[in-house]
Amino acid sequence: MSEKYVVTWDMLQIHARKLASRLMPSEQWKGIIAVSRGGLVPGALLARELGIRHVDTVCISSYDHDNQRELKVLKRAEGDGEGFIVIDDLVDTGGTAVAIREMYPKAHFVTIFAKPAGRPLVDDYVIDIPQNTWIEQPWDMGVVFVPPISGR
């Protein structure tokens, strides 16, 4: 990836609230299925904003830090997804999205970020990201002291 897009906690919350507003009325949803790990934090934010208490996970491994690898389903939520929102942080090349669509064909699949290759596979997303861009999520970064430029 040649570019990086840094996401802050407040940006993520703003984007999640925007997505939640598009998913109203919340009564139409039975629950949320968060794709682990990227969808866990956005899933919690959606659950809060929509007042949804039924939250489950589908655990899929497809990245090793910044390298994409073979998809492996570690745990899945039951059912075909009817009445559920499936949330992930990002749709990239579409590998995970294809697996999600096969497991939950009746779910409403949403992400915060979408790259061009995966965009057609989700029902809704908030932010367009160029395909060659790596997203730095706030949960992957630490807060560090940065000394003043003057050095004083």
From Swiss-Prot:
Q: Where does Mg(2+) bind?
A: D89
As its record notes, the protein acts as a catalyst of: GMP + diphosphate = guanine + 5-phospho-alpha-D-ribose 1-diphosphate; XMP + diphosphate = xanthine + 5-phospho-alpha-D-ribose 1-diphosphate; IMP + diphosphate = hypoxanthine + 5-phospho-alpha-D-ribose 1-diphosphate
Q: In which pathway does it act?
A: Purine metabolism; GMP biosynthesis via salvage pathway; GMP from guanine: step 1/1; Purine metabolism; XMP biosynthesis via salvage pathway; XMP from xanthine: step 1/1
Cofactor dependence: Mg(2+)
Q: How does it sit in the membrane?
A: Peripheral membrane protein
Q: Which residues bind xanthine?
A: D92, I135
What Enzyme Commission number(s) appear in the record? 2.4.2.-, 2.4.2.22
Gene3D superfamilies membership:
3.40.50.2020
Q: Where does GMP bind?
A: R69, D92, T93, G94, G95, T96, W134, I135
Entry's Gene Ontology molecular function annotations:
guanine phosphoribosyltransferase activity; hypoxanthine phosphoribosyltransferase activity; magnesium ion binding; xanthine phosphoribosyltransferase activity
The entry's cellular-component GO terms read: cytosol; plasma membrane
Q: How does it assemble?
A: Homotetramer.
Record family assignment: Belongs to the purine/pyrimidine phosphoribosyltransferase family. XGPT subfamily.
Name of this protein: Xanthine-guanine phosphoribosyltransferase
* Source organism of this protein record: Salmonella typhimurium (strain LT2 / SGSC1412 / ATCC 700720)
Q: What is the lineage of its organism?
A: Bacteria, Pseudomonadati, Pseudomonadota, Gammaproteobacteria, Enterobacterales
- Primary gene name: gpt
